[in-house]
Curated annotation (Swiss-Prot):
Its EC number is 4.2.3.4. Its cofactor is Co(2+); Zn(2+); NAD(+). Keywords: Amino-acid biosynthesis, Aromatic amino acid biosynthesis, Cobalt, Cytoplasm, Lyase, Metal-binding, NAD, Nucleotide-binding, Zinc. It comes from the Bacteria. The keyword Lyase applies. Pfam families: DHQ_synthase, DHQS_C. It catalyses: 7-phospho-2-dehydro-3-deoxy-D-arabino-heptonate = 3-dehydroquinate + phosphate. One of its GO terms (cellular component) is cytoplasm. This is 3-dehydroquinate synthase. Catalyzes the conversion of 3-deoxy-D-arabino-heptulosonate 7-phosphate (DAHP) to dehydroquinate (DHQ). Its main location: cytoplasm.
Length: 359
């Protein structure tokens, strides 16, 4: 069973997302028209899937691999340099090269960024192997590496040629990674009331990992993101900002833990709960709504407990570095109801007061 949908960005060429019930890498062959292929993956995924992927490529291709360490802390300049050096050392040229990102969100982000900047842009293909990367980071063209002062601070908007994935990857995906991915899925439920209702009615099948339901879940999640990206590919109008619900708080958590604590999806789960509480603090929603929204998150196995190893001062400083901020104004994606999120400006003092009473 294959589900296919199209992403139509504002400024870039359209591309397909292919969600498969089985794992058949041959689906990407029509997109590998280049003669030089660099497969970028990490140590974990390489052991599981590299020997399955490489034989799917045709014999006349010049195929090389670049294997990075696994973890958010390796979404770094050093890892980027390793990819670029591999390309240069093997004389890969702009018109003959395609990068393949075989892995989760870190691999997709860093490979996409390498593709964006190598010789001013080369083709790349996304093969996301985690739920989180399937429904979020592989779609929409955001590519980046982290800086010691903040997450995703160095990057570019750069779209892939195609996204191919399969729910077969879940067979080797740790449960913690699966639940982390569910946080991004639940985020889309707060953006779309229809999807909220669908998730609510299919919760048991999702938690049981029913194949047909999971394919539909991934497809619907990608459709929601694709619709937003089509309106505002490069965050010029503000429409795309709603995709960052939970991320302002979540990114700060990751930064404070040096990207070695909560996984990205886990931090987003906590971040959504923080954004919900902040919305209640500001009078945008009732206490009952806040409880209902947080209960919905938790019902999918997602923890919303704030880490106890983060001090408020450090957390506030991390939030001040958020990319959405401008002219010393803090910007948050806040919720007024299911399907009603908005980008709002708040003062540093308002945030400090909220953090004081929420700890």
């Amino acid at each position: 069973m294959i589900s296919k949908l199209s992403v139509n960005p504002t400024f870039s060429p359209s591309y397909n997302i292919i969600v498969d019930s089985v794992l058949d890498f041959s689906h990407i062959l029509e997109y590998v028209t280049n003669k030089q292929v660099l497969v970028v993956t990490n140590t974990t995924v390489a052991k599981l899937y590299l020997t399955k992927f490489l034989p799917a490529l045709v014999d006349d291709l010049d195929v090389r691999t670049c294997i990075l360490e696994d973890g958010e802390q390796y979404k770094s300049q050093q890892s980027l340099d390793k990819i670029l050096s591999t390309l240069l050392e093997n004389h890969f040229t702009r018109n003959s090269t395609v990068l393949v990102a075989l892995g989760g969100g870190v691999i997709g982000d860093i490979t996409g960024f390498a593709a964006a900047i190598y010789q001013r842009g080369i083709d790349f293909i996304q093969i996301p192997t985690t739920l989180l990367s399937q429904v979020d980071s592989s779609v929409g063209g955001k590519t980046a590496i982290n800086h010691q002062l903040g997450k995703n601070m160095i990057g570019a908007f750069y779209q892939p040629k195609v996204v191919y994935t399969s729910i077969e990857f879940y067979k080797t995906l740790p449960q913690r990674e699966y639940i982390a991915g569910m946080a991004e899925v639940v985020k889309y439920a707060f953006i779309s009331k229809d999807f909220y209702l669908w998730l609510d009615s299919n919760r048991d099948k999702i938690l049981a990992k029913d194949s047909v339901t999971l394919i539909e879940m991934v497809k619907r999640s990608c459709q929601i993101k694709a619709q937003v990206v089509a309106m505002d590919e490069k965050e010029l109008t503000g429409a795309r900002a709603i995709l960052n619900f939970g991320h302002t708080f979540g990114h700060a958590i990751e930064k404070c833990q040096n990207y070695r604590g909560l996984k990205h999806g886990e931090a987003v789960g906590v971040g959504m709960a923080q954004a919900i509480d902040f919305s209640h603090y500001l009078g945008l929603i009732s206490q009952q709504q806040a409880k209902d929204f947080k209960d919905f998150i938790v019902s999918f196995g997602i923890s919303i407990d704030f880490p106890n190893d983060i001090c408020q001062k450090e957390f506030l400083e991390a939030m001040l570095l958020d990319k959405k901020n401008s002219n010393k104004e803090l910007k948050f994606i806040l919720i007024e109801n299911i399907g009603s999120l908005s980008l709002q400006k708040q003062s540093k003092n308002e945030l400090e007061q909220f953090l004081d009473i929420s700890r």
